[in-house]
């Protein structure tokens, strides 16, 4: 009765789970109440409108003739069925007084990447989940959490930590957008995903598309280990230059050249660096320049 659906952005998870699944459930059991929560109330109302319009369609009536909308309750974010069930949309942090349900859906608990990086926003969302949303799911009810990962301490991260400590057991459906096997190649083929990866950067790509968030400090290196130094006062050290060379110009792989300093077990210096998609004559000049400096 606990499901996580972790997918990359724009891969249809909301369409299936937040817009079509509630309509299906109410077609099967029109006495049920559904609570749908999203990062903003506007997004929740959008999902509610889609579910409502689906139930109003002739195609739906052909499949589920006994489930109809109550004539006196058809607002996009709050409506009932003719059998007493209904749908209520709320933003994360919103009030649920007097509202509850047998099915609770949380779809995209963070509005932006920046929100997910904020400890304050994450804490408020968690307090709302544990203190408001969770308590409105009736005994025997189900919870579905839909999102793409944004932080190792996001809602899914905390729920999985809670599970490890003996909390609710979650069925996790994870769909990483690997380049070798794109989950929706008709929309996002390998070339499209590679462009997204290049623009997003490693940390966003790992979280949003691979569902594998990494700490802001990194997995292997902590920010607190690094300090700035005055380039005019370089400590005594051994200097060496390394390079990863390519031969294409304005395309293909990058050439990276870096000069480092080593002054013992606790002193490693990044002294100089350059990268570019250039031919050999160009990066040779940059390498010589670093030697000279």
Where are these regions (language model features)?
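Walker A/P-loop
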Residues: 2-21
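Post-Walker A helix-loop "phosphate-sensing" segment adjacent to the P-loop in P-loop NTPases
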Residues: 24-33, 56-60
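Conserved nucleotide-state-sensing and coupling region of NTP-binding domains
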Residues: 37-93
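Conserved RecA-like ASCE ATPase "motif II neighborhood" in helicase/translocase motors
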Residues: 76-132
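ASCE P-loop NTPase helicase motor core
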Residues: 117-182
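ATPase catalytic-site recognition across NTP-hydrolyzing enzymes
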Residues: 181-243
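Gly/Thr-rich phosphate-binding beta-strand-loop-beta motif of the actin/hexokinase/Hsp70
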Residues: 234-262
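Nucleic-acid-processing active sites and adjacent nucleic-acid-binding tracks
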Residues: 258-293
